[in-house]
Amino acid sequence: MTNHIAGGGNPPGPEGDASAGIDVVLVTGLSGAGRGTAAKVLEDLGWYVADNLPPQLITRMVDFGLAAGSRITQLAVVMDVRSRGFTGDLDSVRNELATRNITPRVVFMEASDDMLVRRYEQNRRSHPLQGGHTLAEGIAAERKMLEPVRATADLIIDTSTLSVRGLRENIERAFGGDAAAITSVTVESFGFKYGLPMDADMVMDVRFLPNPHWVDELRPLTGQHQAVSDYVLGRPGASEFLQTYHELLSLVVEGYRREGKRYMTVAIGCTGGKHRSVAIAEALVGLLRSNSRLSVRVLHRDLGRE
């Protein structure tokens, strides 16, 4: 049964043959309808994506994925109509994969003629089937050629009124699995005297907290030691700050998820990156890990530099 998505509908497509050891998705459809964007989303979700592989190479790639020790368990291949034998090529791939007990899912991307014309005119590109004809004629020829493919597709996505974000959400619901639910967050402590982290999405300065450096028994220790952590987190306002900042980050992470961003680096800085920033980073990681939708790691950039 074909699933048809227009605008913000709910996918999800049929399940692939998990017993075969590799899941295969063939992304096809009308030129300009968003095949490349769909492929990029699949890549972000951890799929191995190949663009316009010849049919015989698709089956070889699958064989490689089935081989012992291969890390390719999800393969997405973008197929277009550069070859006049495209429909036969797709049937050939399906038949070859069937001999390996694999039933690929076919995603068909489409859009209205008006929207396709607008996209081509905005990008000032010619249609692959246009030749010496008009753009509208090229689109019509492709639509007719792909009618048999569309009729047997597992998932049809109409991008006429879909934003990039909307397309991403539909692809994630259909093919994301656990990967679509996980955002990777790195909490990085650092010392301002060594410079700001270049890869930070957010930077927080915790130099407003008293510095354990001026406590003789704490000076040789780091924020990873319990005594330093207790000292830093026990200062007035420290626990309130930590809780409030955690709530703020939770809102930001959800915003990142809605925008399709799956990676985030939060930098926590103090003077030398040894005491306060380390203690706060460790405590923040503990709070963030309570969210099962996050994959959280901690990095202490400047620890040990003194």
From Swiss-Prot:
A single Pfam family it belongs to is: RapZ-like_N
List, alphabetically, the SUPFAM superfamilies matched. P-loop containing nucleoside triphosphate hydrolases
Write out the entry's keywords from A to Z.
Answer: ATP-binding, GTP-binding, Nucleotide-binding
For whether the record's keyword set contains Nucleotide-binding, the answer is yes
Q: Which GO terms describe its molecular function?
A: ATP binding; GTP binding
**What InterPro entries does its record include?**
P-loop_NTPase, RapZ-like, RapZ-like_N, RapZ_C
Q: Which residues bind ATP?
A: G29, L30, S31, G32, A33, G34, R35, G36
Q: Which residues bind GTP?
A: D80, V81, R82, S83
Keyword presence, Kinase: no
Q: What exactly does this protein do?
A: Displays ATPase and GTPase activities.
**Entry similarity comment:** Belongs to the RapZ-like family.
PANTHER family xref list: RNASE ADAPTER PROTEIN RAPZ
Official protein name in the record: Nucleotide-binding protein MMAR_2228
Species of origin: Mycobacterium marinum (strain ATCC BAA-535 / M)
Query: What does UniProt list as this organism's lineage?
Result: Bacteria, Bacillati, Actinomycetota, Actinomycetes, Mycobacteriales
